[in-house]
Every structure is written in structure tokens, then in C-alpha cells.
Amino acid sequence: MTQYTPMIQQYLKVKADYQDAFLFFRLGDFYEMFFEDAVKAAHELEITLTSRDGGSSDRIPMCGVPHHAAKNYIEQLVEKGYKVAVCEQVEDPKTAKGVVRREVVQLITPGTMMEGRTIDEKENNFLAALTHFEDGSYALACNDLTTGQNTVTLLTGSVEDILLEVYATGSKEIVVDSSFSKDELNKLTETLKMTISYEDATAIPEGLEHLVKNVSQAKLIKAIGRLFNYVIRTQKRSLDHLQPVEIYYTNQFMKIDVHSKRNLELTETLRTKEKTGSLLWLLDKTKTAMGGRMLKQWMERPLIQKEKVEERLEMVETFVNDYFLREDLKEKLKEVYDLERLAGKVAFGNVNARDLLQLRRSLLQVPAILEAISLLDNAYAARLIQGADPCESLTELLGRSIQENPPLSIKDGDIIKDGYNDKLDQYRYVSKNGKTWIAELEKRERDITGVKSLKIGYNRIFGYYIEVTKANLAALPEGRYERKQTLANAERFITDELKEKETLILEAEEKIVQLEYDLFTALREEVKVFIPKLQHLAKVISELDVLQSFATVSEEEQFVKPVLTTKREIFIKDGRHPVVEKVLNGKLYVPNDCIMPEKMDVFLITGPNMSGKSTYMRQLALVTVMSQIGCFVPATEAVLPVFDQIFTRIGAADDLISGQSTFMVEMLEAKNAIANASERSLILFDEIGRGTSTYDGMALAQAIIEHIHDQIGAKTLFSTHYHELTVLEESLDQLKNVHVSAIEENGKVVFLHKIQDGAADKSYGIHVAQLAELPDSLIARAKEVLAQLEGQEEIIIPKRVEVKVQEQEVIPEPVVVKEEPVEVLEAKVETEEESQLSFFGGEQSSKKQDKLALNQKETAVLAQIKKIDLLDMTPLEAMNELYRLQKKLKKG
């Protein structure tokens, strides 16, 4: 290092402590980066890479950004998952002896960003800390530095279960200790796409003990300690806004795994990963940013305590029934800014005068809000606002201290109102009267000299001056002025009197700016005292905002208040999928009932593709979620139990575990439901078993249905294309067949989207293929094959038998179900095979099958089709292969 210049040596010494971060090294008006940081930053930020002499034989790579634009560049890096260490000059270069002293003042990371475009106003920005214990358990602590919120929970179960809970927090960064295994770290980085940070200290930092008074469990304290130590080490500033730690237990809320949340599109859509089109999008009528964040938190964790849900529902009903109260509340909420994040900025020291003005405007609305709610005859409302302080003294303080239109910077003056500070008023008087004197002096000198163009000006280098054009110099009295500066077309002068006033004016203006800054920082410290009260107010207002949002959307969309029952029964009359109905935008939506008495556990749903089976299933899940977060539901009448968990397998879900086939993911999700569901759970399985052969799929589907029916007893909607399974209604007394109806008109299928009792009579798969505009020749061939397959006389369905756990496997005895044969074309297959395998039977039929005559080329094409593995092909690849084979047949 001795070969480098002192400044580069200083850089390398600081960089050694921040190897995993970009080091923004302050040099005058720029933040500079050197060596590998410079090369990488130039690429990521698309800025010019240069070099400089650093004392060694080779020039050092270098790039930099202006200090006034650094915020934007830092946000870009953090958005990409990087960390940025900000190293400032901490002494005046004019008084420094040798190299200016520099220190890192903040480490900015994805989990500690306080503001900027990466921070969504209606989403939390949680930093997570995960601690692993020898008994296999984990403690998960989370902190949102922007709001001061802290939570902690103890987790048990598989590593995948732990990862799913971590994923549910939405954290972009996770803090672990150095003992975490490489496999664990890979799952966090590759599976959850999180930035990894390390912290081994677990003792609660001095000064933060009061935040964990309600936490006694050693494991939880370790996780919180790790989190707090990391925050203190990286932020290096006041954390007065941190709130007491809230302990939560996952069994206090309805469990919805990540796959199910995605399938149901609770907070984002499957296709675009955006809020628009999700349930959150529909329900979010909140007027405040903090209300929007609370709404999302409620949706992530629906309640399972019936009494708490009913309290929310009653409050929503109050708002629904009182239009004027609700509208008045909404108007006031529009004027309330983000109290939580404003409090965080006050504590952090980066609050400006405009922020404090927003705080005052928000507080002005609070007394009326609290008074209106206090008049309600509602125990929940009374308890909600209990202890809420409107902070009227703070409102008064801000009202008499902050100007109405202050600048963004707190170092340019013009922040503090007249009358707030006597000394400031005196300086302003001197400055104002001094400038008045200057104007009077200018008029007087014009009169004395007779030069009408004479003017008095000011610049920072020369101060105040009298300027006269060269054409008028002869008119000036001899010896009246002292020459100060010569310009091309004018001369500038000074007088003793003007010098004296200049000193007074400039001193006053300089003192004004400094005094205003001092007064503002003192004011900020006074506001800090109110942070706990502001945070309590924020929670009250957020909750009221969410409840009015529920009431607003419930009235607009004609939702109904659900009745919660302790019985295991579902009664939904004219239920609708709330988002689909909204997206249809006034077009006719077909409502459907879902009536499952206490002794009815399984609906086996059949019907054609595109008929609405999946929508019906999602509809029930969304109604359940809406009910248990305290919102009215899309129906004309609804009686619902309180579910403890929702399990879904609907559509193609992403594989968080990574690298698994679609069928494997399907089986893992089925296993998750079977292993964890209770009779208080809701299970939605769509087409289980489709990812394997017909026989395997049908066998698995039947076994899963029987297990849920006999062993779990959970309310279950199970859709299937295996129409043969509908005979299970005869042997499973708590299973009922329902179907989505369709009719044929003029050779075309019309989907009615109506759920009716009984099994579907047809699949209409070929009609769907026609709608997709597959070639006519292919459709015709499919109809021929279908007719042949439907001609099979016998369908083998395994008889249901009792199978005890850990006993020898029992092979079910086949049951023969007779069907009427369908007339087919008489033809002879001219191939080497003498008979065709039965599609439904387990063996070849003894009865000789009718065959369709095929030529040699057609036989070869069929052989190729048999070899195609459709599960390993994309839809586009499948269509291309189909086109190739069709082209080959046409040539023949």
C-alpha cells in the first residue's frame, strides 16, 4: 500500500471494511470510485470509466458522480441488490493538515433504504434477520426502517417451510450469521433472490432494551439482537423511531402458502406480477399510504379468531350504513400524509421543512377524525381510538415556526416564520432595512451625479458596488468614489458608507441562514419527543382507512356482510369472483351458489375447459379470504366457517424449490395439503393427476379424493377431466358431483358458466380445439378417434377398499361399469398390430376392435405422435410439431 498516494491509501483502508459494497468516496463535489468498484459501477450505472495516477506504476480505474446527483445513482445500485457505503469528508479541507479525514456515515442496502423510487408508498420495506438453532428451529425478526415497525416469530418445520415464511415478508435483504451453510445461503439467494448480509452479534444494543420488554424467549431475543446490531452498524444515526417489538405466531392467522397466494392472485397477478388485476387492487380504496400498507398486511395474514373478524365486520357495516360519516372521513384522510414515514425521517435527521409542514397539515385533521369516531356506538371503535393523542401542542408549534412555502433545502434560509425567534427577527430587520437603504442610496447618487443609468449591484466576489457606464464617467464628481473594478463598458466604484452597510447586511444575511438552520434542527429535536404518539396515531388512522376502504368497495360492488358460523358449513348464494366481475366492466357475470352442509365435504367438479371451473374454485377462496380480513363478500347471502388454512393447486404455479417438473410440483403441493390440512381447512385442487399417464393420474386423483374424504374431512373443491371418477359419489357419502353446464347450438358449444348438480355428460374438448382454430382435418380425425374410443364397452374403476396405514398394500378389486356402445366406422387397420389397446381398460379387450384404415405414411406419423413427450414441450413447440406432422400427411 505504501506505493500509493496518501489519499488512495486512505481509500483502501476504508474499503477494507466494506468489501461487499460500492464505496462512494467524497472528493470535493464528487463521489469517486476506484479499482474494481469503478469498473463495475461504470458498467451498472452506464457512466464513463477513466483512470488516475495513484502513485503506483499503473493508473487506477476511476469513475465518479456529482454529489448533488448521487441519490439517483445510489438508488439504481440498491435497486439491483447492491450495497453502497457513503464516505464523507468529516473535516474542513481548508483547516485539514494532510489528507482530509473521511468516514463512512451510512451503509445503504436493499433492506435499509429510507426513501426513493425503490420504496413503494403502500408497501413495507422489511429487512429480515434469520437465526438457526441446534434443535432445528429458526427465529425470524423483521424491521421496516422507514416506519420503525419490528416483528419477530419462532418457526419450526422444513427448510422449505421456513423459506416460504421468509418469502411472505417481502424482504429484499436478510441478515444471517457466518455459520449458515452454503446450501442454506444458495436457497436464500437463488430461490428468494435476496441480498445476504452478515451479523454475529446477538445481544440487544445499549439503549434499545426498552423495545424488547415484552419479549422473554431467548431465541427471539437473539434474532432481534442480530437485526438491531446490523441496523445500528449500517445506519450510524438516531433510531428513536423504532417501535416496540411485536411477537406474532403463525398459528394466529390463516395460513396461505406462497403457491396458493400466487394462484389466487391476492396481491399480484400471475401473468404480469403487478398489483392491477389482483384482489388487493380491487379492495384498495385507502386514502393514505399507511392505510395501503396495513391493508396488504391484513391480506397477507387473515384472522382465524371469529370474534376479531366480527368486530371488523361490524365496523365496516357502520361505515356502509352511514354514507355521510364515511365520505367525511375519506375527505379528511385525503389530507393525511404518511405519519409513520415522516416520524422515521424526523428520527433519522433527514426531515426537511416541507415534511414538517405535511406533518402539521395531517395533524390538523386528527381532532375531527377522533371526535367523529368517538360518537359511534361501537366498542371496537372506542377501543381503537383509546389513548390516541391528537398532538395539538405539536400542531401549534409547527404552525408558528414553519413558513407556508419553505424551500427543499434546510441550509438556504427562509424556513422559519417571523415572530418565532427575536434574534432572527433582528437580523431580518437589519437585512431588510439595509437593502432599503441601498435602494435609497442609489436614488440619491443618481440625483447628485445626474447619471440616470447609475446603479448599485452585488456579486459574491466584490460585494456591493456602484456601476457607471464609461460614457458617463466625466459626469462623476472628482474624488467622490473609489474605483473597485473595470469592465469593458463600465467602471465599478465603492464608498466608505457603502462598505459599512455592506458589512452589516452581509453579516445579517449570513447569520440569518445559520440561525434558521440551528432553529430548525432544534425544532426537529422537539418533534422527536412526539414520535411514539405519532406512531400510535398512524396505526389508528391506518385501521380506520382500511375499514372505510372495505365499506367503500362493499357498497360500490354490492357485497354482503358474511355471517360467521362455528359449524363446518358453507352457504353462499349468488357468489361471484370479485376481480373477474370488475374486469368484465358491466358485462353480464354469471353468479353461482356454493352450498356445502356440515356433512358435505367434497365437491367433485366436472365440465369442459374454459367453462369456469377454476374461476368457481378461486371464487370460494377469495370469498373466504375477504371474509376473514373483515370485508364484505361478493354474494347475496353468505354463511361461512372460519378456515385455518387454504391449499390450492390451480393452474401452472412457479416452482420456488426450483428444478422440479410440473408433475412433481403438483405432487409436492398435494403432499403439503394432505400433510397439513385439518377439517377446518379449505382445499382447492384443479385437475390433479393430469401431468402423468391417464391411469396413473386417475389412480392418484381417486386416492387423494378418498384420503381427503376419509382422513381429513376438509372442505374441498376437486375439479377433474376424469369423468370416470364421478361414480365415487356412490361410495363416498360426503362427496357430491357438480358440473359446469354447457349447451350445443348449431354445432357450436356455448358455455353457460353455471354450476349445477350432477356430473357433466361431455367434455367438449374438441369444441374447444375448434375455438382455438386447429386445422379442420385434425378436428375431423379427432372426432373419428373419439367415436372409436367411446365405443369401448367397459370402463374399469377400482372398487373403494379400506387401507390401514403401515399394513400390507391392498390391491383394489376392479368394478365393471357397463356403458352403451357407440356406433363407429367399420374399417380395417392395415398394420402389423392385430388389435388396438383399450383407452380405458387395463388390458386389451378380448373382443376384436373395429379399426380405421391407415396407409403406411399415416401409420408412421401416428408412431411419431406416440413418441412425443408433450410434458417437455412448450405450447409453441407442440404447435410447430403438429404443423410439421400435418404437412407430412398432406404430402402423402
Curated annotation (Swiss-Prot):
GO terms for cellular component: cytosol. ATP binds at G607, P608, N609, M610, S611, G612, K613, S614. Transmembrane segments: none annotated. It comes from the Bacteria. Keywords: ATP-binding, DNA damage, DNA repair, DNA-binding, Nucleotide-binding. InterPro entries: DNA_mismatch_repair_MutS, DNA_mismatch_repair_MutS-lik_N, DNA_mismatch_repair_MutS/MSH, DNA_mismatch_repair_MutS_C, DNA_mismatch_repair_MutS_clamp, DNA_mismatch_repair_MutS_core, DNA_mismatch_repair_MutS_N, DNA_mismatch_repair_MutS_sf. Gene3D superfamilies: 1.10.1420.10, DNA repair protein MutS, domain I, MutS, connector domain, P-loop containing nucleotide triphosphate hydrolases. Belongs to the DNA mismatch repair MutS family. This protein is involved in the repair of mismatches in DNA. It is possible that it carries out the mismatch recognition step. This protein has a weak ATPase activity. This is DNA mismatch repair protein MutS. It comes from Bacillus cereus (strain G9842). The gene is mutS.
